[in-house]
């Protein structure tokens, strides 16, 4: 490989690293809302998986404790799935056009 080619690869790697850092910061600051019970329970979570807010519909206050616990858990799980999907989508859009070896996934 020629020196110019190696320098180009190094520059490309540095640019990719900068893009990855920016993407990770954007994801960390993003907020998603997970829901369950047809919207009766909603959980707002950051990309860092920090729960910022839980909203319960007033009609749930008469429900059995176990039902409420299940709905909250389902809403949290929904939020986590949305964060993971957003991360996969951003990574895929960022790496589109890159020729990665088969089976190689980012972030490493």
Curated annotation (Swiss-Prot):
The keyword DNA-binding applies. Keywords: Cytoplasm, DNA-binding. Its main location: cytoplasm. Binds to DNA and alters its conformation. May be involved in regulation of gene expression, nucleoid organization and DNA protection. InterPro entries: YbaB-like_sf, YbaB/EbfC. Belongs to the YbaB/EbfC family. Residues 85-108 are annotated as: Disordered. This is Nucleoid-associated protein PSPTO_3645. Residues 85-96 have a biased composition (Polar residues). PANTHER family: NUCLEOID-ASSOCIATED PROTEIN YBAB (PTHR33449:SF1). Pfam families: YbaB_DNA_bd. NCBIfam families: DNA_YbaB_EbfC. Homodimer. It is found in: Cytoplasm, Nucleoid. GO terms for cellular component: bacterial nucleoid; cytosol. It comes from the Bacteria. One of its GO terms (molecular function) is DNA binding.
């Amino acid at each position: 490989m020629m020196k110019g080619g190696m320098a180009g690869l190094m520059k490309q790697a540095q640019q990719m690293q900068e893009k990855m850092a920016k993407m990770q910061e954007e994801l960390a600051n993003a907020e998603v809302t997970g829901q369950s019970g047809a919207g009766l329970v909603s959980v707002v979570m950051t990309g860092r998986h920090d729960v910022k807010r839980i909203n319960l519909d007033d009609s749930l206050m008469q429900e059995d404790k176990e039902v409420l616990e299940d709905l909250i858990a389902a809403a949290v799980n929904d939020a986590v799935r949305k964060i993971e999907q957003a991360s996969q989508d951003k990574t895929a859009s960022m790496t589109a056009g890159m020729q990665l070896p088969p089976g190689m996934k980012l972030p490493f």
